[in-house]
Amino acid sequence: MQDLAKTKINIKSPAKINLHLEVIGKREDGFHELAMIMQNIDLSDYLEFEINNEGLIKLESDCNDLSLSDDNLIVKSANLLRKKSNIDYGANIFLRKNIPIGAGLAGGSSNSAATLIGLNKLWDLNLGQEALCSLASTLGSDIPFFINGGIQLCFGRGEVLEKLDSNFEYGVILLKNPNVSVSTAETYKKYSNRFCHQYLTDREMIENIRKNLRENGLNNLNLDNQHLSIKNDLQLVVENENDSVKQALYLLSKLENCLTFSMSGSGPTCFALFKDIETAKKELTANYKLFRNKGYDSWVCTFLEKGITFI
């Protein structure tokens, strides 16, 4: 019989950026109707899972700014999976945190999905991707994206996914002021207050927006496109109210080889795209001190073809 107490699993849990974020309307369930393109990047957290026979979920981390109790998404995800699967085992979980918190990079959602995927294997549950996505959607709107990973069209409140095929090799520079965070809920509320008169309710019009993103979303991001651009509706709210975001976007716009720049999610992290990782590294090396002096942490990374992976 397998000694389950010695079984360990390690997982890489990557962040995401939004290559398109369009707020279409308000749904009957209170969430917003969205049309997005989300892309995994190789700024990642790492999680280690080990079975315990106590039937408890125990979370530890190298990050002192995180709650490790039942309100943590990792713990919530583990308890949900354990309850739905009706098993007696628990798990000891260690999180090594690299993705900044409250940054618009969805580190918490990535960790949640990594927990579902990791414990599904650790506990030998054999749940398929569809079942994991169903559980993920009850925990958060963008968690199903991380179950699938890579680059995806995301519709509905973010849980309706369509896989995109791309081989983008862009380099990415990220900027975030470590002392600044943005509330996603508050940002959507402010956006709604300003732009609710533009919201669509007609299903045919909403489907036309989805169709347009399916057909043109990747073309808008293609290196051959002379007008390479990224749309983020939430930036209209956050940039005007947050000097840190406004300055980050300005700094990125002035980088010599920047192809385009935007805010990710509800912010405050901002990013710029470059033709390849080598160009991005050179730009960061040349500007690192400037970014630091202006109060920003900075990272350079690439796009990932896959999301959460076992290591």
Curated annotation (Swiss-Prot):
It catalyses: 4-CDP-2-C-methyl-D-erythritol + ATP = 4-CDP-2-C-methyl-D-erythritol 2-phosphate + ADP + H(+). Pfam families: GHMP_kinases_C, GHMP_kinases_N. Pathway: Isoprenoid biosynthesis; isopentenyl diphosphate biosynthesis via DXP pathway; isopentenyl diphosphate from 1-deoxy-D-xylulose 5-phosphate: step 3/6. The active site is at K16, D142. SUPFAM superfamilies: GHMP Kinase, C-terminal domain, Ribosomal protein S5 domain 2-like. Its EC number is 2.7.1.148. ATP binds at P100, I101, G102, A103, G104, L105, A106, G107, G108, S109, S110. GO terms for molecular function: 4-(cytidine 5'-diphospho)-2-C-methyl-D-erythritol kinase activity; ATP binding. Keywords: ATP-binding, Isoprene biosynthesis, Kinase, Nucleotide-binding, Transferase. One of its GO terms (biological process) is terpenoid biosynthetic process. It is an enzyme of class 2 (transferase). Belongs to the GHMP kinase family. IspE subfamily. Catalyzes the phosphorylation of the position 2 hydroxy group of 4-diphosphocytidyl-2C-methyl-D-erythritol. This is 4-diphosphocytidyl-2-C-methyl-D-erythritol kinase. The gene is ispE.
